[in-house]
Amino acid sequence: MGIQTSPVLLASLGVGLVTLLGLAVGSYLVRRSRRPQVTLLDPNEKYLLRLLDKTTVSHNTKRFRFALPTAHHTLGLPVGKHIYLSTRIDGSLVIRPYTPVTSDEDQGYVDLVIKVYLKGVHPKFPEGGKMSQYLDSLKVGDVVEFRGPSGLLTYTGKGHFNIQPNKKSPPEPRVAKKLGMIAGGTGITPMLQLIRAILKVPEDPTQCFLLFANQTEKDIILREDLEELQARYPNRFKLWFTLDHPPKDWAYSKGFVTADMIREHLPAPGDDVLVLLCGPPPMVQLACHPNLDKLGYSQKMRFTY
């Protein structure tokens, strides 16, 4: 004699299954809605972002905060990449690269720390910086064109890099246990992006060594951020400064980047070493590369932003 199933029991089971299915679908949709959306979907497209805030960082540097499309958007910038800002000034197209000081953990906004080069201040650049002065003139609510991600280097974690020799070449994998960095002025922003990405992962064994060059002590941007990271991760991050015009009680190096500075504060040449460079072209070409040559760092051990 077969087992007869009660219609009431079947109905109850059906309702239960529908309820469970509904809960599963609802949970999936909630998780999906909470997943951050990416702003930079196409590196060839321009995205208009609105200025939210502008604050003074130092005597010649400001932090610009731009709103992303929604509070749940991230910029969508891989570590190692940068963005371009573009605008027309006096009828001419002006494009400049920048690396945000925020990351894709920050939702709803992106921050840029930029030195404002004013007209008539520097004798070599009497007109000042076109883009930086334009940004400084913006009012809250004004929009700027963003484009990206751009760049030849990507950090994928735990010492692994993908580096393109040029824009048309495929990326080549590179592994570094020790990361040397030489930055000048606002060239610190891509370094800080990378340092933060490495240090926030306890399992990342990469050691970071930064030599940061500036003209005067008041020109050192993001110093508090760097010194906080050094204090928090003393075994993973080493920080050293050099100034062209240091104060009397200066505890770090003086003058342009030299071979001795590199030897003392960056990892020695080796297959597990990568040295990153970002700063004014004269510093990179006339001070950094010749001294790296002198100390035996091969071209494969270097990358210039």
UniProtKB/Swiss-Prot annotation:
One of its GO terms (biological process) is sterol biosynthetic process. GO terms for molecular function: cytochrome-b5 reductase activity, acting on NAD(P)H; FAD binding. Widely expressed. It catalyses: 2 Fe(III)-[cytochrome b5] + NADH = 2 Fe(II)-[cytochrome b5] + NAD(+) + H(+). It is found in: Membrane. It is a single-pass membrane protein. Its cofactor is FAD. InterPro entries: CBR-like, Cbr1-like_FAD-bd_dom, FAD-bd_FR_type, Flavoprot_Pyr_Nucl_cyt_Rdtase, FNR_nucleotide-bd, OxRdtase_FAD/NAD-bd, Riboflavin_synthase-like_b-brl. The keyword Protein transport does not apply. Its EC number is 1.6.2.2. GO terms for cellular component: cytosol; endoplasmic reticulum membrane; extracellular exosome; membrane; mitochondrion; plasma membrane; platelet alpha granule membrane. It is an enzyme of class 1 (oxidoreductase). Residues 44-156 form the FAD-binding FR-type domain. SUPFAM superfamilies: Ferredoxin reductase-like, C-terminal NADP-linked domain, Riboflavin synthase domain-like. The chain crosses the membrane at residues 8-28. Belongs to the flavoprotein pyridine nucleotide cytochrome reductase family. NADH-cytochrome b5 reductases are involved in desaturation and elongation of fatty acids, cholesterol biosynthesis, drug metabolism, and, in erythrocyte, methemoglobin reduction. This is NADH-cytochrome b5 reductase 1. It comes from Homo sapiens.
